[in-house]
Design a protein with these regions (language model features):
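Substrate-binding surface in catalytic domains of secreted glycosidases
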Residues: 180, 219-242, 313-465
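Glycan-binding loop/region signatures in secreted carbohydrate-active enzymes
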Residues: 167-175, 217-238, 250, 254, ...
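Surface-exposed amphipathic alpha-helices with a cationic face
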Residues: 170-173, 250-267, 271, 325-344, ...
Length: 565
Protein backbone atom coordinates (compact mmCIF):
# COMPACT_ATOMS: atom_id res chain seq x y z
CA UNK A 1 0.00 0.00 0.00
CA UNK A 2 1.31 3.44 -0.88
CA UNK A 3 0.67 5.63 2.15
CA UNK A 4 1.05 9.33 2.61
CA UNK A 5 4.37 8.74 4.34
CA UNK A 6 5.83 7.12 1.26
CA UNK A 7 8.20 9.93 0.37
CA UNK A 8 11.11 11.70 1.97
CA UNK A 9 11.12 15.06 3.70
CA UNK A 10 14.65 15.07 5.14
CA UNK A 11 15.87 17.60 2.56
CA UNK A 12 13.70 20.27 0.93
CA UNK A 13 15.34 19.94 -2.45
CA UNK A 14 18.25 18.11 -3.97
CA UNK A 15 19.61 19.15 -7.33
CA UNK A 16 21.73 16.60 -9.17
CA UNK A 17 24.36 17.85 -11.55
CA UNK A 18 27.44 20.02 -11.33
CA UNK A 19 26.71 23.46 -9.94
CA UNK A 20 29.45 26.08 -10.04
CA UNK A 21 30.07 28.15 -6.96
CA UNK A 22 27.58 30.91 -6.77
CA UNK A 23 25.34 29.36 -9.40
CA UNK A 24 22.45 28.78 -7.00
CA UNK A 25 20.71 31.25 -4.74
CA UNK A 26 18.35 30.11 -2.00
CA UNK A 27 15.97 32.64 -0.59
CA UNK A 28 13.68 32.07 2.37
CA UNK A 29 10.56 34.18 2.15
CA UNK A 30 8.63 34.47 5.37
CA UNK A 31 5.39 36.34 5.45
CA UNK A 32 2.75 36.51 8.11
CA UNK A 33 -0.08 36.00 5.65
CA UNK A 34 1.30 33.25 3.39
CA UNK A 35 3.17 29.95 3.53
CA UNK A 36 6.94 29.56 3.59
CA UNK A 37 8.69 28.88 0.30
CA UNK A 38 12.19 27.79 -0.66
CA UNK A 39 13.33 28.88 -4.10
CA UNK A 40 16.37 27.59 -5.99
CA UNK A 41 17.29 29.30 -9.25
CA UNK A 42 19.99 27.77 -11.40
CA UNK A 43 21.64 30.03 -13.96
CA UNK A 44 23.37 27.33 -16.00
CA UNK A 45 22.52 24.21 -18.01
CA UNK A 46 21.51 21.48 -15.62
CA UNK A 47 19.46 18.35 -15.24
CA UNK A 48 16.92 18.22 -12.43
CA UNK A 49 14.78 15.31 -11.25
CA UNK A 50 11.57 15.82 -9.31
CA UNK A 51 9.57 13.34 -7.25
CA UNK A 52 6.33 14.39 -5.56
CA UNK A 53 4.00 12.49 -3.20
CA UNK A 54 1.14 10.47 -4.62
CA UNK A 55 -1.45 12.47 -2.72
CA UNK A 56 -0.26 15.57 -4.53
CA UNK A 57 -0.02 13.89 -7.90
CA UNK A 58 -3.48 12.39 -7.77
CA UNK A 59 -5.50 15.56 -7.33
CA UNK A 60 -3.50 18.72 -6.79
CA UNK A 61 -1.55 19.36 -9.98
CA UNK A 62 -2.85 22.54 -11.53
CA UNK A 63 -1.62 25.11 -13.97
CA UNK A 64 -1.47 28.48 -12.26
CA UNK A 65 -1.17 31.98 -13.67
CA UNK A 66 2.26 33.52 -13.42
CA UNK A 67 0.91 36.22 -11.12
CA UNK A 68 0.35 33.86 -8.22
CA UNK A 69 2.87 33.52 -5.45
CA UNK A 70 5.54 30.97 -6.19
CA UNK A 71 5.53 31.43 -9.96
CA UNK A 72 8.82 30.67 -11.69
CA UNK A 73 11.46 33.27 -12.33
CA UNK A 74 11.68 32.07 -15.94
CA UNK A 75 8.93 31.80 -18.54
CA UNK A 76 5.35 32.03 -17.31
CA UNK A 77 3.81 30.16 -20.24
CA UNK A 78 2.33 26.77 -19.57
CA UNK A 79 0.57 23.94 -21.36
CA UNK A 80 -0.30 20.42 -20.35
CA UNK A 81 1.31 17.90 -22.69
CA UNK A 82 0.05 14.64 -21.29
CA UNK A 83 -1.38 13.08 -18.19
CA UNK A 84 -1.27 9.41 -17.35
CA UNK A 85 -1.90 7.38 -14.24
CA UNK A 86 -1.78 3.78 -13.11
CA UNK A 87 -1.75 1.70 -9.96
CA UNK A 88 2.04 1.67 -10.01
CA UNK A 89 2.75 5.33 -10.67
CA UNK A 90 1.22 8.61 -11.71
CA UNK A 91 2.89 11.06 -14.04
CA UNK A 92 2.02 14.47 -15.40
CA UNK A 93 4.18 16.04 -18.09
CA UNK A 94 3.94 19.76 -18.75
CA UNK A 95 5.96 22.21 -20.76
CA UNK A 96 7.63 25.41 -19.63
CA UNK A 97 5.69 26.08 -16.42
CA UNK A 98 4.28 23.71 -13.81
CA UNK A 99 2.81 24.57 -10.44
CA UNK A 100 1.91 21.75 -8.06
CA UNK A 101 -0.12 23.09 -5.14
CA UNK A 102 -1.14 21.56 -1.84
CA UNK A 103 -4.50 22.49 -0.31
CA UNK A 104 -4.42 25.77 1.54
CA UNK A 105 -6.06 26.07 4.94
CA UNK A 106 -5.89 28.55 7.78
CA UNK A 107 -3.68 26.32 9.89
CA UNK A 108 -1.61 24.49 7.28
CA UNK A 109 0.93 25.85 4.84
CA UNK A 110 0.57 25.37 1.14
CA UNK A 111 3.39 25.26 -1.32
CA UNK A 112 4.29 24.64 -4.89
CA UNK A 113 6.68 22.97 -7.22
CA UNK A 114 7.32 25.13 -10.27
CA UNK A 115 9.57 24.45 -13.23
CA UNK A 116 10.02 26.64 -16.29
CA UNK A 117 10.69 23.67 -18.54
CA UNK A 118 9.35 20.26 -19.50
CA UNK A 119 8.96 18.11 -16.39
CA UNK A 120 7.61 14.74 -15.41
CA UNK A 121 6.60 14.08 -11.83
CA UNK A 122 6.12 10.52 -10.63
CA UNK A 123 5.14 9.04 -7.32
CA UNK A 124 6.79 6.51 -5.10
CA UNK A 125 5.09 3.13 -5.12
CA UNK A 126 6.01 1.94 -1.64
CA UNK A 127 7.40 3.10 1.67
CA UNK A 128 10.58 5.16 2.00
CA UNK A 129 12.63 2.01 2.42
CA UNK A 130 11.52 0.71 -0.98
CA UNK A 131 11.49 3.56 -3.52
CA UNK A 132 10.73 2.31 -7.01
CA UNK A 133 9.63 5.41 -8.86
CA UNK A 134 10.98 6.27 -12.26
CA UNK A 135 12.10 9.82 -12.83
CA UNK A 136 12.57 11.62 -16.13
CA UNK A 137 15.15 14.39 -16.51
CA UNK A 138 14.25 18.04 -16.73
CA UNK A 139 16.47 19.89 -19.15
CA UNK A 140 16.71 23.57 -19.96
CA UNK A 141 19.57 24.85 -22.13
CA UNK A 142 19.57 28.27 -20.47
CA UNK A 143 18.01 28.36 -16.99
CA UNK A 144 15.98 26.17 -14.70
CA UNK A 145 13.83 27.46 -11.88
CA UNK A 146 12.34 25.12 -9.30
CA UNK A 147 10.32 26.35 -6.36
CA UNK A 148 9.76 23.76 -3.69
CA UNK A 149 7.02 24.60 -1.23
CA UNK A 150 6.35 23.18 2.19
CA UNK A 151 3.29 21.02 1.81
CA UNK A 152 0.71 20.33 4.52
CA UNK A 153 1.81 18.06 7.32
CA UNK A 154 -1.08 15.78 6.43
CA UNK A 155 0.87 14.67 3.36
CA UNK A 156 3.46 12.93 5.50
CA UNK A 157 3.52 11.33 8.89
CA UNK A 158 4.89 13.75 11.46
CA UNK A 159 6.97 15.88 9.08
CA UNK A 160 6.36 18.43 6.33
CA UNK A 161 6.00 16.80 2.95
CA UNK A 162 8.86 18.37 1.05
CA UNK A 163 9.36 16.97 -2.46
CA UNK A 164 12.80 15.50 -2.99
CA UNK A 165 14.61 15.47 -6.29
CA UNK A 166 16.05 11.97 -6.43
CA UNK A 167 18.55 10.06 -8.50
CA UNK A 168 16.71 8.48 -11.42
CA UNK A 169 17.50 6.18 -14.27
CA UNK A 170 20.15 7.81 -16.44
CA UNK A 171 18.86 9.88 -19.33
CA UNK A 172 19.07 8.23 -22.75
CA UNK A 173 22.13 10.18 -23.82
CA UNK A 174 24.72 8.38 -25.90
CA UNK A 175 28.04 8.40 -24.04
CA UNK A 176 29.95 6.06 -26.34
CA UNK A 177 29.88 2.41 -27.37
CA UNK A 178 30.30 -0.31 -24.80
CA UNK A 179 33.03 -2.92 -25.24
CA UNK A 180 32.58 -5.52 -22.52
CA UNK A 181 34.17 -8.85 -21.65
CA UNK A 182 33.45 -11.77 -19.34
CA UNK A 183 36.29 -12.76 -17.02
CA UNK A 184 36.00 -16.13 -15.26
CA UNK A 185 37.24 -17.12 -11.82
CA UNK A 186 38.17 -20.63 -12.99
CA UNK A 187 40.29 -19.13 -15.78
CA UNK A 188 42.85 -17.88 -13.25
CA UNK A 189 44.19 -21.41 -12.68
CA UNK A 190 45.05 -24.51 -14.68
CA UNK A 191 46.13 -24.71 -18.29
CA UNK A 192 45.82 -21.51 -20.31
CA UNK A 193 45.33 -19.54 -17.10
CA UNK A 194 44.62 -15.86 -17.52
CA UNK A 195 45.07 -13.28 -14.77
CA UNK A 196 43.17 -10.02 -14.24
CA UNK A 197 46.33 -7.98 -14.82
CA UNK A 198 46.31 -9.21 -18.44
CA UNK A 199 42.94 -7.65 -19.22
CA UNK A 200 43.18 -4.97 -21.95
CA UNK A 201 41.38 -2.47 -19.75
CA UNK A 202 42.13 0.52 -21.98
CA UNK A 203 40.01 -1.17 -24.68
CA UNK A 204 37.15 -2.11 -22.34
CA UNK A 205 34.19 -0.38 -20.73
CA UNK A 206 32.73 -3.27 -18.69
CA UNK A 207 34.14 -6.43 -17.11
CA UNK A 208 31.64 -9.11 -16.06
CA UNK A 209 33.11 -11.39 -13.40
CA UNK A 210 31.73 -14.94 -13.73
CA UNK A 211 30.15 -16.71 -11.96
CA UNK A 212 28.50 -16.35 -8.56
CA UNK A 213 26.56 -19.34 -7.21
CA UNK A 214 23.03 -19.52 -5.77
CA UNK A 215 21.95 -21.30 -2.57
CA UNK A 216 18.65 -23.16 -2.32
CA UNK A 217 17.17 -20.32 -0.23
CA UNK A 218 18.12 -17.79 -2.92
CA UNK A 219 21.33 -16.44 -1.39
CA UNK A 220 23.86 -15.35 -3.99
CA UNK A 221 27.35 -16.40 -2.92
CA UNK A 222 30.89 -16.74 -4.20
CA UNK A 223 31.62 -19.90 -6.16
CA UNK A 224 35.37 -19.61 -5.52
CA UNK A 225 36.29 -17.49 -2.52
CA UNK A 226 40.01 -18.09 -3.03
CA UNK A 227 39.99 -16.77 -6.60
CA UNK A 228 37.68 -13.92 -5.64
CA UNK A 229 39.33 -12.49 -2.53
CA UNK A 230 42.00 -14.91 -1.28
CA UNK A 231 44.63 -15.32 -3.98
CA UNK A 232 47.75 -13.17 -3.52
CA UNK A 233 49.18 -11.41 -6.55
CA UNK A 234 52.37 -9.39 -6.90
CA UNK A 235 52.52 -6.52 -4.39
CA UNK A 236 49.81 -8.14 -2.26
CA UNK A 237 50.70 -8.81 1.38
CA UNK A 238 51.72 -12.51 1.33
CA UNK A 239 51.66 -12.84 5.12
CA UNK A 240 48.49 -10.85 5.78
CA UNK A 241 50.36 -8.25 7.81
CA UNK A 242 48.09 -5.49 6.56
CA UNK A 243 45.60 -4.62 9.25
CA UNK A 244 41.96 -5.44 8.85
CA UNK A 245 39.80 -7.79 6.83
CA UNK A 246 40.94 -7.18 3.26
CA UNK A 247 40.00 -8.40 -0.20
CA UNK A 248 42.72 -9.78 -2.44
CA UNK A 249 42.41 -12.00 -5.49
CA UNK A 250 40.52 -10.95 -8.61
CA UNK A 251 38.28 -8.56 -6.66
CA UNK A 252 41.19 -6.38 -5.57
CA UNK A 253 42.70 -6.34 -9.06
CA UNK A 254 39.41 -5.32 -10.64
CA UNK A 255 38.99 -2.52 -8.12
CA UNK A 256 42.50 -1.27 -8.94
CA UNK A 257 41.62 -1.34 -12.63
CA UNK A 258 38.60 0.84 -11.85
CA UNK A 259 40.71 3.34 -9.93
CA UNK A 260 43.09 3.71 -12.86
CA UNK A 261 40.35 3.72 -15.50
CA UNK A 262 37.42 5.76 -14.25
CA UNK A 263 35.17 4.79 -17.17
CA UNK A 264 35.60 1.05 -16.52
CA UNK A 265 32.67 -0.70 -14.81
CA UNK A 266 32.72 -4.15 -13.18
CA UNK A 267 29.71 -6.42 -12.68
CA UNK A 268 29.01 -9.59 -10.73
CA UNK A 269 27.72 -12.24 -13.12
CA UNK A 270 25.40 -14.75 -11.47
CA UNK A 271 24.48 -18.18 -12.76
CA UNK A 272 25.96 -19.36 -16.02
CA UNK A 273 25.30 -22.74 -17.56
CA UNK A 274 26.28 -24.84 -14.52
CA UNK A 275 24.32 -22.86 -11.93
CA UNK A 276 21.32 -21.98 -14.10
CA UNK A 277 19.04 -24.79 -12.78
CA UNK A 278 19.20 -23.06 -9.39
CA UNK A 279 17.33 -20.06 -10.80
CA UNK A 280 14.16 -22.08 -11.29
CA UNK A 281 12.93 -22.55 -7.68
CA UNK A 282 14.33 -19.20 -6.55
CA UNK A 283 12.64 -17.13 -9.24
CA UNK A 284 9.31 -18.90 -8.61
CA UNK A 285 9.12 -17.88 -4.95
CA UNK A 286 8.66 -14.31 -3.73
CA UNK A 287 10.59 -14.76 -0.49
CA UNK A 288 13.53 -16.35 -2.25
CA UNK A 289 13.50 -13.64 -4.90
CA UNK A 290 13.93 -11.07 -2.14
CA UNK A 291 16.79 -13.06 -0.63
CA UNK A 292 18.40 -13.37 -4.05
CA UNK A 293 18.15 -9.66 -4.77
CA UNK A 294 19.32 -8.51 -1.35
CA UNK A 295 22.27 -10.90 -1.22
CA UNK A 296 23.28 -10.13 -4.81
CA UNK A 297 23.41 -6.42 -4.01
CA UNK A 298 25.39 -7.08 -0.83
CA UNK A 299 27.98 -9.20 -2.64
CA UNK A 300 28.19 -6.57 -5.38
CA UNK A 301 28.86 -3.87 -2.78
CA UNK A 302 31.32 -6.03 -0.83
CA UNK A 303 33.31 -6.52 -4.04
CA UNK A 304 33.12 -2.88 -5.10
CA UNK A 305 31.28 -3.63 -8.35
CA UNK A 306 28.99 -1.44 -10.44
CA UNK A 307 26.11 -3.83 -10.99
CA UNK A 308 24.93 -7.40 -11.46
CA UNK A 309 24.55 -9.62 -14.51
CA UNK A 310 22.00 -12.46 -14.60
CA UNK A 311 22.92 -15.40 -16.82
CA UNK A 312 19.99 -17.85 -16.69
CA UNK A 313 20.39 -20.49 -19.41
CA UNK A 314 17.44 -20.80 -19.95
CA UNK A 315 13.87 -20.45 -18.69
CA UNK A 316 12.12 -23.60 -19.94
CA UNK A 317 8.69 -22.12 -20.63
CA UNK A 318 6.61 -18.95 -20.52
CA UNK A 319 5.88 -19.37 -16.80
CA UNK A 320 9.57 -19.41 -15.95
CA UNK A 321 9.94 -16.46 -18.29
CA UNK A 322 7.48 -14.51 -16.13
CA UNK A 323 9.36 -15.57 -13.02
CA UNK A 324 12.48 -14.08 -14.60
CA UNK A 325 10.66 -10.75 -14.93
CA UNK A 326 9.75 -10.84 -11.24
CA UNK A 327 13.33 -11.69 -10.29
CA UNK A 328 14.63 -8.74 -12.28
CA UNK A 329 12.04 -6.49 -10.65
CA UNK A 330 13.21 -7.58 -7.20
CA UNK A 331 16.81 -6.88 -8.18
CA UNK A 332 16.00 -3.43 -9.55
CA UNK A 333 14.13 -2.53 -6.37
CA UNK A 334 17.00 -3.82 -4.21
CA UNK A 335 19.58 -1.80 -6.16
CA UNK A 336 17.49 1.37 -6.01
CA UNK A 337 16.86 0.84 -2.30
CA UNK A 338 20.60 0.35 -1.76
CA UNK A 339 21.41 3.63 -3.56
CA UNK A 340 18.67 5.45 -1.69
CA UNK A 341 19.59 4.21 1.78
CA UNK A 342 23.29 4.99 1.32
CA UNK A 343 22.67 8.33 -0.42
CA UNK A 344 24.60 7.22 -3.51
CA UNK A 345 23.77 9.28 -6.63
CA UNK A 346 24.63 6.42 -8.97
CA UNK A 347 22.60 3.93 -10.98
CA UNK A 348 23.92 0.43 -10.41
CA UNK A 349 23.42 -1.71 -13.49
CA UNK A 350 21.38 -4.80 -14.26
CA UNK A 351 22.49 -6.70 -17.33
CA UNK A 352 21.17 -9.97 -18.72
CA UNK A 353 22.92 -12.60 -20.84
CA UNK A 354 20.14 -13.23 -23.35
CA UNK A 355 19.66 -15.91 -26.03
CA UNK A 356 19.83 -15.29 -29.76
CA UNK A 357 18.05 -18.44 -30.90
CA UNK A 358 14.23 -18.51 -31.10
CA UNK A 359 13.93 -21.76 -29.14
CA UNK A 360 14.97 -19.90 -25.99
CA UNK A 361 14.26 -16.24 -26.73
CA UNK A 362 10.59 -16.89 -27.55
CA UNK A 363 10.01 -18.17 -24.00
CA UNK A 364 11.04 -14.85 -22.50
CA UNK A 365 8.90 -11.80 -21.89
CA UNK A 366 11.57 -9.52 -23.32
CA UNK A 367 9.41 -6.41 -23.16
CA UNK A 368 8.55 -7.08 -19.52
CA UNK A 369 12.19 -7.74 -18.67
CA UNK A 370 13.35 -4.61 -20.46
CA UNK A 371 11.66 -2.44 -17.82
CA UNK A 372 14.37 -3.50 -15.38
CA UNK A 373 17.32 -4.26 -17.69
CA UNK A 374 20.01 -1.70 -18.53
CA UNK A 375 22.01 -3.83 -20.97
CA UNK A 376 21.15 -6.92 -23.02
CA UNK A 377 24.21 -9.09 -23.62
CA UNK A 378 22.94 -10.88 -26.72
CA UNK A 379 24.73 -14.24 -26.88
CA UNK A 380 25.19 -14.20 -30.65
CA UNK A 381 27.17 -17.42 -30.76
CA UNK A 382 26.80 -21.18 -30.29
CA UNK A 383 24.52 -21.27 -33.32
CA UNK A 384 25.87 -24.74 -33.97
CA UNK A 385 27.77 -27.42 -32.09
CA UNK A 386 27.75 -31.04 -31.01
CA UNK A 387 23.94 -30.95 -30.72
CA UNK A 388 23.52 -30.41 -34.48
CA UNK A 389 23.48 -33.04 -37.21
CA UNK A 390 25.57 -30.97 -39.62
CA UNK A 391 28.49 -28.57 -39.40
CA UNK A 392 27.88 -24.84 -39.54
CA UNK A 393 28.91 -21.33 -38.58
CA UNK A 394 28.63 -20.72 -34.85
CA UNK A 395 28.36 -16.91 -34.89
CA UNK A 396 27.54 -15.77 -38.42
CA UNK A 397 26.20 -12.28 -38.91
CA UNK A 398 23.77 -13.20 -41.71
CA UNK A 399 22.21 -16.28 -43.24
CA UNK A 400 23.90 -17.63 -46.36
CA UNK A 401 21.80 -18.67 -49.39
CA UNK A 402 24.72 -20.80 -50.55
CA UNK A 403 25.04 -22.57 -47.21
CA UNK A 404 21.51 -22.60 -45.73
CA UNK A 405 22.09 -25.69 -43.58
CA UNK A 406 25.22 -24.05 -42.12
CA UNK A 407 23.40 -20.83 -41.20
CA UNK A 408 20.13 -21.93 -39.63
CA UNK A 409 20.45 -19.00 -37.21
CA UNK A 410 21.95 -15.55 -37.61
CA UNK A 411 22.80 -12.54 -35.49
CA UNK A 412 20.85 -10.20 -37.76
CA UNK A 413 17.66 -12.22 -37.30
CA UNK A 414 18.13 -12.17 -33.52
CA UNK A 415 18.65 -8.41 -33.40
CA UNK A 416 15.58 -7.84 -35.58
CA UNK A 417 13.50 -10.02 -33.25
CA UNK A 418 14.56 -7.99 -30.19
CA UNK A 419 13.92 -4.72 -31.99
CA UNK A 420 10.50 -5.95 -33.10
CA UNK A 421 9.52 -6.42 -29.46
CA UNK A 422 10.48 -2.86 -28.62
CA UNK A 423 13.92 -3.44 -27.10
CA UNK A 424 15.92 -0.24 -27.67
CA UNK A 425 18.86 -1.07 -29.97
CA UNK A 426 21.25 1.00 -27.87
CA UNK A 427 20.68 -1.40 -24.96
CA UNK A 428 21.80 -4.43 -27.00
CA UNK A 429 25.43 -5.57 -26.95
CA UNK A 430 26.41 -7.98 -29.70
CA UNK A 431 28.19 -11.05 -28.34
CA UNK A 432 31.42 -12.24 -29.97
CA UNK A 433 33.06 -15.57 -29.04
CA UNK A 434 36.79 -15.83 -28.39
CA UNK A 435 36.66 -19.54 -29.12
CA UNK A 436 35.82 -21.84 -31.97
CA UNK A 437 33.75 -25.00 -32.35
CA UNK A 438 35.27 -27.97 -34.12
CA UNK A 439 33.78 -30.81 -36.19
CA UNK A 440 35.72 -33.93 -37.15
CA UNK A 441 35.56 -36.21 -40.16
CA UNK A 442 33.51 -33.85 -42.28
CA UNK A 443 33.70 -32.78 -45.91
CA UNK A 444 32.79 -29.15 -45.27
CA UNK A 445 30.15 -26.60 -44.27
CA UNK A 446 26.63 -27.91 -43.83
CA UNK A 447 27.82 -31.51 -44.04
CA UNK A 448 27.61 -34.45 -41.66
CA UNK A 449 30.43 -35.06 -39.19
CA UNK A 450 31.59 -37.89 -36.93
CA UNK A 451 32.46 -36.04 -33.72
CA UNK A 452 33.81 -32.85 -32.18
CA UNK A 453 36.99 -34.19 -30.63
CA UNK A 454 37.99 -34.93 -27.08
CA UNK A 455 39.82 -31.64 -26.58
CA UNK A 456 37.50 -29.33 -24.66
CA UNK A 457 34.37 -30.94 -26.06
CA UNK A 458 35.02 -29.35 -29.41
CA UNK A 459 35.68 -25.88 -27.96
CA UNK A 460 39.04 -24.36 -28.94
CA UNK A 461 40.43 -20.99 -27.83
CA UNK A 462 40.68 -18.44 -30.62
CA UNK A 463 44.34 -17.75 -29.79
CA UNK A 464 45.17 -21.35 -30.81
CA UNK A 465 43.48 -21.08 -34.23
CA UNK A 466 43.79 -21.89 -37.02
CA UNK A 467 45.32 -25.26 -36.28
CA UNK A 468 48.63 -26.12 -37.95
CA UNK A 469 47.90 -27.41 -41.45
CA UNK A 470 44.43 -25.85 -41.64
CA UNK A 471 43.44 -23.25 -44.22
CA UNK A 472 41.31 -20.26 -43.25
CA UNK A 473 38.26 -19.64 -45.45
CA UNK A 474 35.60 -16.90 -45.70
CA UNK A 475 31.84 -16.95 -46.28
CA UNK A 476 31.03 -13.60 -47.87
CA UNK A 477 27.25 -14.00 -47.50
CA UNK A 478 27.35 -14.89 -43.81
CA UNK A 479 30.33 -12.62 -43.06
CA UNK A 480 31.85 -15.54 -41.21
CA UNK A 481 35.20 -17.38 -41.36
CA UNK A 482 36.10 -20.99 -40.75
CA UNK A 483 39.13 -23.23 -41.15
CA UNK A 484 39.42 -26.63 -42.78
CA UNK A 485 42.19 -29.22 -42.83
CA UNK A 486 42.04 -31.43 -45.91
CA UNK A 487 44.22 -34.05 -44.24
CA UNK A 488 42.49 -34.42 -40.88
CA UNK A 489 39.08 -33.36 -42.28
CA UNK A 490 38.53 -31.09 -39.29
CA UNK A 491 36.40 -27.96 -39.64
CA UNK A 492 36.49 -25.17 -37.03
CA UNK A 493 34.09 -22.20 -36.92
CA UNK A 494 35.40 -19.11 -35.11
CA UNK A 495 35.70 -15.33 -35.32
CA UNK A 496 38.67 -13.39 -36.66
CA UNK A 497 39.58 -9.69 -36.85
CA UNK A 498 37.92 -9.61 -40.27
CA UNK A 499 34.56 -10.90 -39.02
CA UNK A 500 34.85 -8.72 -35.91
CA UNK A 501 35.32 -5.67 -38.13
CA UNK A 502 32.08 -6.49 -39.96
CA UNK A 503 30.31 -6.90 -36.62
CA UNK A 504 31.58 -3.51 -35.45
CA UNK A 505 30.21 -1.95 -38.63
CA UNK A 506 26.92 -3.72 -37.99
CA UNK A 507 26.81 -2.32 -34.44
CA UNK A 508 27.30 1.20 -35.76
CA UNK A 509 24.85 0.84 -38.63
CA UNK A 510 22.12 -0.65 -36.41
CA UNK A 511 22.95 1.81 -33.61
CA UNK A 512 23.42 -0.95 -31.08
CA UNK A 513 24.97 -0.28 -27.70
CA UNK A 514 28.23 -2.04 -28.47
CA UNK A 515 29.70 -5.51 -28.12
CA UNK A 516 30.86 -8.01 -25.53
CA UNK A 517 33.15 -11.04 -25.59
CA UNK A 518 33.00 -14.49 -24.06
CA UNK A 519 35.57 -14.79 -22.60
CA UNK A 520 38.84 -12.99 -21.82
CA UNK A 521 41.07 -16.06 -21.75
CA UNK A 522 40.59 -16.91 -25.43
CA UNK A 523 41.68 -13.67 -27.10
CA UNK A 524 45.03 -12.93 -28.67
CA UNK A 525 47.21 -9.97 -27.78
CA UNK A 526 48.25 -7.29 -30.23
CA UNK A 527 46.87 -6.56 -33.68
CA UNK A 528 45.11 -9.94 -33.93
CA UNK A 529 43.08 -9.24 -30.78
CA UNK A 530 39.32 -9.36 -31.31
CA UNK A 531 38.74 -7.01 -28.38
CA UNK A 532 41.22 -4.51 -29.79
CA UNK A 533 39.70 -4.78 -33.27
CA UNK A 534 36.24 -4.06 -31.91
CA UNK A 535 37.45 -1.17 -29.76
CA UNK A 536 39.29 0.53 -32.61
CA UNK A 537 36.43 -0.06 -35.05
CA UNK A 538 33.77 1.35 -32.73
CA UNK A 539 35.96 4.36 -32.08
CA UNK A 540 34.21 6.20 -29.26
CA UNK A 541 33.93 4.08 -26.12
CA UNK A 542 31.53 4.74 -23.25
CA UNK A 543 32.68 7.64 -21.07
CA UNK A 544 30.20 7.26 -18.21
CA UNK A 545 31.97 7.09 -14.83
CA UNK A 546 32.26 4.11 -12.52
CA UNK A 547 31.67 4.07 -8.76
CA UNK A 548 34.39 3.68 -6.13
CA UNK A 549 32.76 4.56 -2.78
CA UNK A 550 31.64 1.48 -0.81
CA UNK A 551 31.68 2.34 2.91
CA UNK A 552 29.36 -0.61 3.53
CA UNK A 553 31.74 -3.26 2.11
CA UNK A 554 32.84 -5.96 4.54
CA UNK A 555 36.40 -5.56 3.22
CA UNK A 556 38.43 -2.82 4.86
CA UNK A 557 40.61 -2.01 1.84
CA UNK A 558 37.56 -1.58 -0.42
CA UNK A 559 35.85 0.57 2.22
CA UNK A 560 38.96 2.76 2.29
CA UNK A 561 39.22 2.98 -1.50
CA UNK A 562 42.13 0.52 -1.79
CA UNK A 563 44.97 2.63 -0.35
CA UNK A 564 48.56 1.49 -0.79
CA UNK A 565 49.55 -1.84 -2.36
Amino acid sequence: MRGVSSWVSSAPILVLGGLAAGAAAVEEQKRADCPTFWTTTIFMPTTVYVTAPEALMSSNIVSRPSSVIGSPTGSSSRSVVSSTSSSASQRITLTTSLTAVGPSTADSASGSVTASLTVTLSTFTSAVEEPTSTQVPIKDPITSSVTSGIFPSSVTSGAPGIPTIRRPSPPPIFSGYKNAIYFTNWGTSGNSSYQPQELPVSELTHILYAFADIDANGTVKSSDAFADVGKRYARDDPHNRTRGHNAYGVVKQLYLHKKRNRNLKTLLSIGGFDYSPKFVPVAADEARRRVFATSAVKLMADYGFDGIDLDWEYPADAEQGQHFVLLLKACREALDRFSFQHRIPYRFLITVASPAGPVNSHKLDLAGMDTYVDIWNLMAYDYTGSWDNTTGHQSNLYRSPRHPSATKLSTDNAVRYYEGLGIPPNKILLGVPTYGRSFESTSGLGQAYAGVGAEGGGVLLYKTLPRPGARELWDEDAKAPWSYDNTTRELVSYDTPRSTLFKARYVRRKRLGGAFFWEARGDRAGAASLVNTMSKSLGWLDQSPNHLWYPMSQYDNIRRGMPGP
